[in-house]
Swiss-Prot record:
Pfam families: GIY-YIG (PF01541), SLX1_C (PF21202)
Family: Belongs to the SLX1 family.
Protein name: Structure-specific endonuclease subunit SLX1 homolog
GO cellular component: Slx1-Slx4 complex
Superkingdom of origin organism: Eukaryota
EC number in record: 3.1.-.-
Record HAMAP family: Endonuc_su_Slx1
Molecular function terms from GO: 3'-flap endonuclease activity; 5'-flap endonuclease activity; crossover junction DNA endonuclease activity; enzyme binding; zinc ion binding
Biological process terms in GO annotation: double-strand break repair via homologous recombination; embryo development ending in birth or egg hatching; interstrand cross-link repair; larval development; meiotic chromosome separation; meiotic DNA double-strand break processing; negative regulation of nematode larval development; positive regulation of embryonic development
Function: Catalytic subunit of a heterodimeric structure-specific endonuclease that resolves DNA secondary structures generated during DNA repair and recombination. Has endonuclease activity towards branched DNA substrates, introducing single-strand cuts in duplex DNA close to junctions with ss-DNA.
Zinc fingers classed as SLX1-type: ranges: 237-293
Keywords: DNA damage, DNA recombination, DNA repair, Endonuclease, Hydrolase, Metal-binding, Nuclease, Nucleus, Zinc, Zinc-finger
């Protein structure tokens, strides 16, 4: 094994229990690293809904659903053994706080074979915001195997002499974020341990629409509205004026507290792609502008909102609220 190869573990997919978003009642996952949390601004509608819940009684449990989380992370070994120290491991998770504990606890506690007895490990960064687990797992595999990925192999990415193992992995990730199909996703690059942060390569910075954040990941839940007046019908598409028959084909304007427009997914995608002359070359836009109110949105944010609407509708499947659309912005906690 060469010196370069000794610093990078050839990673195989590790087995992990994939959690599905289910209904929970106001519970949060413990934060393993740091204390930074994702905060949400309150609106007048949120204050009204909060007051309504207080009126129903202090012991009233408001049902909620866990928002989807699909992330691909990079670990860095702090092993006292110089043979393992500073090696990197790339993995996929739906719960980074739990996953780092598993890696450091060992294989018998759910950690991966390639990290067993080679730590302790630090989870330095994670890229999240993927629309589904398949998309995240494909990103994980390409990050692990850039020389095999048809999206990256032509770049012939090699570790530079002055480059650390993590620096090389960061450069690969930046190339991926600038390559199809990942450059079209509204992802977040999160530094979990800011003290280990290093500058992005100047020749391949992340795209401007990729958010760069710091601090630990906090699982977010969405409260499910319980009142009939908090819902509306799907109605008609604001572009083609035809009925929207299913929530699976519905997208809401990002400014849904003030703009009540609903769209067919295909209609809004076509509108945004035509605006940048990409309709014949792309399936969906990176971002767009609401044709009614003019607010700028990221396509990935609308898809995440749609997934939450589908989960809310599944919860309401046995009630009169089935196939109804929540009004305004949903409350996060």
């Amino acid at each position: 094994m060469s010196a370069d190869e000794s610093n990078i573990i050839c990673i195989e997919d590790d087995e992990e229990n994939i959690e599905e978003s289910g209904v929970k009642y106001s519970d949060k996952l413990p934060v393993c690293q740091g204390s930074s949390k994702i905060l949400c601004r309150s609106s007048s509608q949120e204050v009204i809904q909060e007051n309504e819940r207080k009126k129903r009684g202090k012991n009233y449990a408001v049902p909620s659903i866990l928002d989807d989380f699909f992330g691909v992370y990079c670990l860095l070994s702090r092993s006292p053994n110089r043979y393992f120290k500073n090696r990197c491991y790339i993995g996929y998770t739906v719960n980074p706080n739990r996953r780092i504990r598993q890696h450091n606890a060992g294989k018998e506690f759910g950690g991966a074979k390639k990290t067993d007895h080679r730590g302790p490990w630090d989870m330095v960064c994670i890229i999240h915001g993927f629309p589904n687990s398949v998309s995240a797992l494909r990103f994980e595999w390409a990050w692990q195997n850039p020389e095999k990925s048809r999206r990256l192999r032509l770049l012939n990415l090699k570790k530079r002499t002055s480059e650390t193992a993590f620096g090389f992995r960061l450069r690969i990730a930046c190339h991926m974020l600038n390559s199809d199909p990942w450059r079209r996703l509204s992802l977040t690059f999160r530094w979990l341990l800011p003290e280990l942060e290093i500058p992005f390569p100047l020749d391949v910075l992340p795209p401007s629409h990729i958010a760069v954040e710091h601090g630990a990941v906090t699982k977010i839940s969405t409260l499910i509205p319980q009142l009939q007046e908090e819902y509306d019908v799907a109605g008609t598409c604001s572009l083609c004026l035809k009925p929207i028959l299913s929530i699976s084909e519905l997208l809401r304007c990002h400014a849904n507290e003030t703009c009540k427009s609903h769209f067919h997914m295909r209609c809004l995608s076509k509108h945004a792609l035509n605006a940048v002359d990409e309709y014949r070359t792309s399936l969906f836009p990176i971002q767009g502008q609401c044709p009614k109110c003019g607010v700028v949105y990221l396509w990935g944010d609308l898809i995440r909102d749609q997934r939450i609407l589908l989960a809310v509708n599944k919860f309401n499947s046995s009630s009169t609220l089935f196939n109804m659309i929540p009004r305004g912005k949903l409350i996060k906690m």
